[in-house]
Amino acid sequence: MADPGGFLKYTHRKLPKRRPVPLRLRDWREVYEEFDNESLRQQATRCMDCGIPFCHNGCPLGNLIPEWNDLVRRGRWRDAIERLHATNNFPDFTGRLCPAPCEPACVLGINQDPVTIKQIELEIIDKAFDEGWVQPRPPRKLTGQTVAVVGSGPAGLAAAQQLTRAGHTVTVFEREDRIGGLLRYGIPEFKMEKRHLDRRLDQMRSEGTEFRPGVNVGVDISAEKLRADFDAVVLAGGATAWRELPIPGRELEGVHQAMEFLPWANRVQEGDDVLDEDGQPPITAKGKKVVIIGGGDTGADCLGTVHRQGAIAVHQFEIMPRPPDARAESTPWPTYPLMYRVSAAHEEGGERVFSVNTEAFVGTDGRVSALRAHEVTMLDGKFVKVEGSDFELEADLVLLAMGFVGPERAGLLTDLGVKFTERGNVARGDDFDTSVPGVFVAGDMGRGQSLIVWAIAEGRAAAAAVDRYLMGSSALPAPVKPTAAPLQ
């Protein structure tokens, strides 16, 4: 049971400090300093163990948040990791990368700062690894059933681990040369050092999961052979078709998609031989004036990356207006709030420009040298140009970080013959099943661009569906349905 007076004794939210900006810009390590145990215990003590814990509603995984908060308060760390792992395969990922929709749903947040749920989660799993409590959990016996998982992002990894532990023989296919999907090549090292991913993959290998990187299913292996070789297939390739900006000058050299840029920086951190004679990757911000188009998380990832590469000026454009400093009335508690946020990357520099639309890229000798843009306002649900607001901004590197529109259809999905939704995602039934028998879909490939916590939840739920398809029943947890939606 929680301390009934804890939230009265400790009324303020406390988080670990970020390392000083001048220091962290000199390396690619994670930005946060260590958090002391007493401060963490105080934060866990603030949890009220609500009769109706709305934090559960905010988390699609159904994490047992009040339970492990209280276990941390009482110093029962090993019990805490057992509770945490009961609902989340990878708290080491979510504790670093999830925007924590559980926190704005915290009841304490109605009139105080919410409990620092995400930080408590991260400290539990990091301590568990440090103490050697995270061990492989191979199945007691094998079922003789085989499953192919296509895609090694969080949805694919969660599905693979659950199915392996259920006794199925699981092979994960990844078209890139390393396992991890966007966790490997999309997320910068300063947000999550890849050693955290690698130790999880080591655990999964020890449990019996087979990984096959460098295999592009639909190209190197046909859809027909995949279905013939495996009893079930889980599609978890993500929503990797990026949103384009079809304006004059798009073809100019120096205009790149974020997901063309970020992987190079990650490959450098992996130690790959990708540097030119000047010690720079093929796409670099060193010594350049950079404009990032897109104000979301991917844009912030680009922002932190170009700072570390040595950009001399950075602007980040967002077509939407600047959010309010406090929770907007349109997103009341317990929904995820629309509000102005300053990430670690924003703290490091650059200028954020809101309510602006880019209309053309200007080039010199085939290379981008500037862009033309104007301010916009919202009128009847549409963006309208503000007359007389035109401007031109110098730029010799432009990064498009405007999100993703759905999965890539060419190749595997077309060959399989799966049906799609009106929004372009892979259509699925109530059990994550596609229109093709024995083929299931989890994560962004079926849901559309979403959060890591939804990807893991869908991976777990799809694993339960596959297990039930193969065995007739399943004891695996299924935290979400395909139709589940965030609090709104």
UniProtKB/Swiss-Prot annotation:
What are the UniProt keywords, alphabetically?
4Fe-4S, Amino-acid biosynthesis, Glutamate biosynthesis, Iron, Iron-sulfur, Metal-binding, NADP, Oxidoreductase
**Cofactor annotation comment:** Binds 1 [4Fe-4S] cluster.
Q: Which cofactor does it need?
A: [4Fe-4S] cluster
Q: Which GO terms describe its cellular component?
A: cytosol; plasma membrane
Query: Which is an annotated GO molecular function term of this record?
Result: 4 iron, 4 sulfur cluster binding
Main enzyme class = oxidoreductase
GO terms classed as biological process: L-glutamate biosynthetic process
The record's annotation in InterPro entries points to: DPD_II, FAD/NAD-bd_sf, FAD/NAD-binding_dom, Glut_synth_ssu1, Glutamate_Synthase, Helical_ferredxn
Keyword Heme belongs to the record: no
Q: What is its EC number?
A: 1.4.1.13
Q: Where is the 4Fe-4S ferredoxin-type domain?
A: 38-69
Involved pathway(s): Amino-acid biosynthesis; L-glutamate biosynthesis via GLT pathway; L-glutamate from 2-oxoglutarate and L-glutamine (NADP(+) route): step 1/1
Q: Tell me, what's a Pfam family for it?
A: Pyr_redox_2
Catalyses:
2 L-glutamate + NADP(+) = L-glutamine + 2-oxoglutarate + NADPH + H(+)
NCBIfam families in UniProt: GOGAT_sm_gam
Further notes on this entry? Was identified as a high-confidence drug target.
Entry protein name? Glutamate synthase [NADPH] small chain
